[in-house]
């Protein structure tokens, strides 16, 4: 049986950009509790975005997140011994969480450049509607579309 619902923790906005989304990105980048290192990576990547695009990095980042956020995903559902991939709508907080996760994962997967450059390039690519994170979103949507026949199994 399920226990009670997990409480949603309040997250403090980022000290430099006063934005909760940036704070979430910093937390996603952070490894082993090294927040200062994560902040340095994020801020340097924002400077890089400013340099390359000439636009406000915060706006670019927010638009990139908006572009990567998925609408649908598939969830496994067991029905009489068979497991079906059932397409379901993604809830609001999870949309943002997945978008951040995919952007960071895509940046980490690239090699040969400093992390701040990889992150900035992935954010810029997502802003333009290209890149690995956008590919991931499209794959998830394709999977949901392919399993549309099982939509009636939603719970």
UniProtKB/Swiss-Prot annotation:
CC per GO annotation: small ribosomal subunit
**Matching Pfam families:** Ribosomal_S7
InterPro entries named among the record's database cross-references: Ribosomal_uS7, Ribosomal_uS7_bac/org-type, Ribosomal_uS7_CS, Ribosomal_uS7_dom, Ribosomal_uS7_dom_sf
Subunit note: Part of the 30S ribosomal subunit. Contacts proteins S9 and S11.
Summary of the function given for this chain in its UniProt record: One of the primary rRNA binding proteins, it binds directly to 16S rRNA where it nucleates assembly of the head domain of the 30S subunit. Is located at the subunit interface close to the decoding center, probably blocks exit of the E-site tRNA.
Which HAMAP family does UniProt cross-reference here? Ribosomal_uS7_B
* Name this polypeptide is given: Small ribosomal subunit protein uS7
Q: What is the lineage of its organism?
A: Bacteria, Thermotogati, Thermotogota, Thermotogae, Thermotogales
């Amino acid at each position: 049986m399920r226990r009670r619902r997990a409480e949603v923790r309040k997250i403090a906005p980022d000290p430099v950009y006063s934005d909760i989304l940036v704070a979430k990105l910093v937390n996603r980048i952070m490894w082993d509790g090294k927040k200062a290192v994560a902040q340095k990576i994020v801020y340097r990547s924002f400077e890089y975005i400013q340099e390359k695009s000439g636009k406000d990095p915060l706006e670019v980042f927010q638009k990139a997140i908006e572009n990567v956020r998925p609408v649908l995903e598939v969830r496994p559902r067991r029905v009489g011994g068979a497991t079906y991939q059932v397409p379901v709508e993604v809830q609001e907080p999870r949309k943002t969480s997945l978008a951040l996760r995919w952007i960071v994962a895509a940046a980490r997967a690239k090699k040969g450049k400093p992390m701040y450059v990889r992150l900035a390039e992935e954010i810029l690519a997502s802003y333009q509607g290209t890149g690995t994170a956008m590919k991931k979103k499209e794959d998830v949507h394709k999977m949901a579309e392919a399993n549309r026949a099982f939509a009636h199994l939603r719970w």
